[in-house]
């Protein structure tokens, strides 16, 4: 059978988790194959009133009878993951080796990786990272000096020494007033090691597990972390993440051949946003307008980072960047979230249809932060609508201007829209009939 994929087409925070949550019931396995604790997503379990914030556990955990897999391409943070498992259980959902497996080949985020990340972000080389240590665990991976999850089965004294040694090395780089004592280093390393104990029960050869299911005719849903424009190769380098966020990267991070690839669903928000540094060509510069679009901190569907609570920068809808993402990911269907937020822009909304760059007009975006900073958007104005959409469930009940907005995306991107989000809850999704 096939492996279907859901990927973000913008810069993260598109609402992928809620569409995975919606579709998960149709699949035997829900898997994550990239990203790490720096990639947050939220789901609202059936019957729950409060959202569940996840980072490393797949969104399918909201379905107790589904197997969730964390693949070899994920950068795993053991203390954070252990806490996440407890949070899921506190929400009334079971977690065991029956519904969660983790690749033995996943690389581990160590305490000194996070320390290095924090140190860099406090200096002049800050890039607006989530301080999750991802860049540094990735560096160790490609230097072939990393520690994989399989190492937690080594004698604990050996692993403890490796972790402590990393802390000691970084400790020497710190200013005198921030250095840790030997006792503090030992304590930090020991706490990290203890967090790996409960993970042992979930460790498996997930490549074998997933491929066995596919050969048996089962369906697998791969959930992409972050989004296209944060991809290490095709994104706005260097304001990117440290892994591939494309469909091909996700397949590699799960150990699945491209011959199993089925449907690719690309998720985009009707409201564009971005957390951290890097250019935002269509950025809303009117701060009062940006605040209105963003919404208040603490509300489920407001524009604040799941991982950091940082306010997201707000932009106008951008079809130029979306064309790159649709092309390289081979997107078959579009899911649009937050259609209900479009009227926050005002009576009309500006939609970027092309850029001017170095005296030429282009319909796709350059994959470079430097080049993007030199682009100017060309907009088409679309009228918004007055009707509240949060209770709409039938496409035929959408106001005409909302339909025009959706169909403008379809025409410009050459891909059908199949699902439309009009609120944060699982049921607040409109299925768009095919033409």
Q: Where do the protein language model's features map onto the residues?
A:
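Non-transmembrane, aqueous-exposed alpha-helical and coiled segments at domain scale
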Residues: 1-435
């Amino acid at each position: 059978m096939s492996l279907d994929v859901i990927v973000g087409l913008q810069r993260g925070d598109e609402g992928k988790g809620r569409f995975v949550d919606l579709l998960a019931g149709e699949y035997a396995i829900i898997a994550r194959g990239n990203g790490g604790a720096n990639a947050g997503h939220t789901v609202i379990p059936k019957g729950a009133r409060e959202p569940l914030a996840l980072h490393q556990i797949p969104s399918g955990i909201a379905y107790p009878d589904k197997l969730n897999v964390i693949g070899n391409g994920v950068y795993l943070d053991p203390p954070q993951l252990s806490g996440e498992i407890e949070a899921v259980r506190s929400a009334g959902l079971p977690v065991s080796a029956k519904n969660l497996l983790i690749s033995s080949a996943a690389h581990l985020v160590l305490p000194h990786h996070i320390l290095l990340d924090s140190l860099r972000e406090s200096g002049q080389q800050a890039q607006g990272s989530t301080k999750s240590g991802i860049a540094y665990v990735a560096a160790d991976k490609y230097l072939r000096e990393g520690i994989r999850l399989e190492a937690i089965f080594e004698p604990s004294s050996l692993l403890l020494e490796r972790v402590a040694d990393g802390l000691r090395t970084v400790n020497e780089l710190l200013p005198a007033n921030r250095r840790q004592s030997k006792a503090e280093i030992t304590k930090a390393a020991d706490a990290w090691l203890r967090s790996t104990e409960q993970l042992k029960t979930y460790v498996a050869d997930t490549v074998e597990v997933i491929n066995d299911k596919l050969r048996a005719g089962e369906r697998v849903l791969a959930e992409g972390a972050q989004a296209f424009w944060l991809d290490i190769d095709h994104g706005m380098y260097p304001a990117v993440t440290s892994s591939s966020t494309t469909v091909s990267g996700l397949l590699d991070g799960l150990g699945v051949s491209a011959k199993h690839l089925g449907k690719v669903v690309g998720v985009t928000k009707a409201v564009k946003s971005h957390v951290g540094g890097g250019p935002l060509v269509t950025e809303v510069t009117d701060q009062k307008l940006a605040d209105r679009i963003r919404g208040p901190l603490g509300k489920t569907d407001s524009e604040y980072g799941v991982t950091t609570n940082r306010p997201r920068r707000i932009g106008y809808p951008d079809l130029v960047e979306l064309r790159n993402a649709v092309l390289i990911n081979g997107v078959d269907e579009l899911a649009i979230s937050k259609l209900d937020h479009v009227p926050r822009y005002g009576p009309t909304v500006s939609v970027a249809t092309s850029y001017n760059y170095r005296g030429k007009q282009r319909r796709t975006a350059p994959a470079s932060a430097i080049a993007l900073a030199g682009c100017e958007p060309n907009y088409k104005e679309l009228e918004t609508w007055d009707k509240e959409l949060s209770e709409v469930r039938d496409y035929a009940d959408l106001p005409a201007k909302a339909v025009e907005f959706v169909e403008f995306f379809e025409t410009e991107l050459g891909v059908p829209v199949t699902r439309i989000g009009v609120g944060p809850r699982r049921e607040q999704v409109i299925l768009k009939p095919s033409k």
